[in-house]
Amino acid sequence: MLRTHLAGSLRSEHAGQTVTLTGWVARRRDHGGVIFIDLRDASGVSQAVFREGEAAEQAHRLRAEYCVRVTGVVEQRPDGNENPELPTGQIEVNVRELEVLNESAPLPFQLDEQPGEEARLKHRYLDLRREGPAHAIRLRSKVNAAAREVLARHEFVEVETPTLTKSTPEGARDFLVPARLQPGNFYALPQSPQLFKQLLMVGGIERYFQIARCYRDEDFRADRQPEFTQLDIEMSFVEQADVILLAEEILVALWKLIGYEIPTPIPHMTYAEAMRRFGSDKPDLRFGVEITECTEYFKNTPFRVFQAPYVGAVVMPGGASQPRRQLDAWQEWAKQRGAKGLAYVLVNEDGSLGGPVAKNLSDAEREGLAKHVGAEPGDCVFFAAGPAKAQRALLGAARGEIARKVGLIDENAWSFVWIVDAPLFEPADDATASGDVALGHSAWTAVHHAFTSPKPESLDTFDTDPGSALAYAYDIVCNGNEIGGGSIRIHRRDVQERVFKVMGIGEQEAQEKFGFLLDAFAYGAPPHGGIAFGWDRIVALLAGLDSIREVIAFPKTGGGVDPLTDAPAPITAQQRKEAGLDAKPEQAEVKKAEQAG
């Protein structure tokens, strides 16, 4: 080894010892001919001092981020010079020998400052030398180890599934990779290991896990990455409660890393209740504002806007004191979410109602409205009217915005909930409106994915009444973030084919796209289920960071660009020719048949 000790490990008990340290020059200070440097390595920082001799002469040329090796004697710092902010703040290293291992060019940004995102990603290798980014990456490693420890106790088998596979759409677009040896044919990068882990269950593995890389070619969305990581788990001969029990054990182990004990069992909430009360299937339960349904209350209203299939309200505590410009800003906020606006009523201090909506209501409606929605004098009541799903979603978003503006969220709190009994299917138009790819050609598509089993009570009727069918699925939500989702899977070919049929996938297409899975079900496929955790999001939550980019070693921008390597990039004409990108499908099929023959 080039060093005897880590820079961050030195303490008073090392005084008098000769040590060799390696690392980077974080700072250099010159005090009356005596040079001090903060020497940083992965473990922390130690102060090195150059007082005399050849090493002191050499130290004059040191600059920020020079990579160096120093040898010297550990000494107690003089009284009054201690640094209580550093674990090594009681000591310093009196350097006798200095070796510059590598010089550094002038820095594009100072590491003790907060540069812009573009600069950070362009020079990510420098960004990772900073304490925050480095801590996030090391925390991620500990998270991986903690999960593996739990799964090892339960005798799970870690299996690597293919990353070059067949295009089998799962709710987003595939990244495609040309097969050079079969021009015109393409591999797809997996959106998840879903089908392979089910095949592992058919293969008798019984308990599988993988820290899996996944790829989805999605349109631009805030804080999404085209490649991301899941902790993927599958188990044979289990029911929903078994998967949830294991998942909670893993979550408890992860949050212990930051000193928090998750109370278990984690409460359950049905999808229908979550949408009704919070307007979201991933509700943030750290604050208590809820949606109040007002459809029945306004059933005879003279106000045409509220003559709608659904009317709901959410209260903003103290919101009546907002100036007009802020109330106008709420309208713009709603329009950005596809709504026409956000109706509101102000509850005055004397209990009377103000605002443009109030004068359109009947006397009886005005009289009882504050009580009905739970508003107090000084509050503002926001309303949404129209189709229930869209209006609840708008009010759910308003609920979160209210909490942020009013300061209702305890940033140190953790709130977990399981969302269960989600619909098995949703209208295909709803999926495409939210930016997903609707699998199939029917009016219906899967809410989770096409391999989720119906609940037992929906098994006989899901294809005749798709809108009422419930999924045997469960999602885990933390502080308004979906951090994992799973389901009991379909393990019978006839049920899987019925699900495909509801989605408009006929027998021929099903065999073409998913025949390998359907064929496997014919050989005694066991009942099975599992869960996948969003690993990037979980690590970001544990690290107290808002963006998953902060916990990925080399992330891309929101638009899928890597400023470090300039990916994606054009390819040469020769590469294009070799990849067979311009080969026609019929030519590819002939070539494939020839090779098979």
Curated annotation (Swiss-Prot):
Superkingdom as given in the UniProt entry: Bacteria
Which key words are in the record? Aminoacyl-tRNA synthetase, ATP-binding, Cytoplasm, Ligase, Nucleotide-binding, Protein biosynthesis
Q: Does the keyword Cell membrane apply?
A: no
Q: What is its EC number?
A: 6.1.1.23
Q: Which molecular function terms from Gene Ontology are attached?
A: aspartate-tRNA ligase activity; aspartate-tRNA(Asn) ligase activity; ATP binding; nucleic acid binding
Annotated site location: Important for tRNA non-discrimination: 31, 80
Oligomeric state and partners? Homodimer.
Query: Which family is this protein grouped under?
Result: Belongs to the class-II aminoacyl-tRNA synthetase family. Type 1 subfamily.
Function as written in the Swiss-Prot or TrEMBL entry: Aspartyl-tRNA synthetase with relaxed tRNA specificity since it is able to aspartylate not only its cognate tRNA(Asp) but also tRNA(Asn). Reaction proceeds in two steps: L-aspartate is first activated by ATP to form Asp-AMP and then transferred to the acceptor end of tRNA(Asp/Asn).
Question: Under what name is this protein listed?
Answer: Aspartate--tRNA(Asp/Asn) ligase
In which organism is this protein found?
Nocardia farcinica (strain IFM 10152)
Q: Which gene encodes it?
A: aspS
